Regions:
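N-terminal positive-inside, membrane-proximal cytosolic segments immediately preceding the first
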Residues: 1-8
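Hydrophobic membrane-insertion alpha-helices, especially the h-region
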Residues: 11-26
Length: 148
């Protein structure tokens, strides 16, 4: 391993560490955000249809995410994570998931004073708030009970 490899690894770890620390602070600050009421079966069904239309291209038809989703690309952006039980989506409060979907990752974090490169675009101009909540309800409906 030459000096440039060491520097590249150091830089990548620094970006992940600093971004992760900022993201953790943001998550803790939004942990008490209230969500919509318990979704009905029709809401979950609509959420599945919307997920397939707007989300599956990046997050996978089976919510599996993109390959090697824990490793940032050359641009410093992490691939789309899975939304099944193997990912980290279930760790986040509903309000965080809503903001990320509506505003996009970078904008949602920027509201909290966190600078972080995210490949997640915002869908607030394409989806209503109710539709975003239905997508979240669909994703959550696929998780094992212990992760809901």
């Amino acid at each position: 391993m030459d000096a440039s490899d060491v520097m590249r690894r150091y830089l990548m770890l620094s970006v992940i560490f600093l971004g992760g620390g900022g993201a953790a602070a943001w998550l803790m600050s939004t942990a008490g955000v209230l969500t919509e009421s318990t979704p009905e079966a029709a809401d979950i069904a609509q959420g599945e249809d919307l997920y397939r239309e707007y989300c599956a291209a990046c997050h996978g038809a089976d919510l599996e995410g993109q390959p090697d989703w824990r490793s940032a690309g050359p641009d410093g952006v992490l691939p789309a994570p899975p939304h099944d039980e193997t990912g980290h989506t279930w760790h986040h409060p509903d309000g965080v998931l809503f903001d990320y979907t509506k505003l996009g990752g970078k904008a949602a974090l920027a509201l909290q004073g966190v600078e972080f490169e995210s490949g997640m675009p915002g869908f607030g101009d394409q989806l209503s708030d109710a539709e975003i909540w239905n997508i979240i309800a669909y994703i959550q409906s696929t998780w094992p009970e212990r992760q809901r």
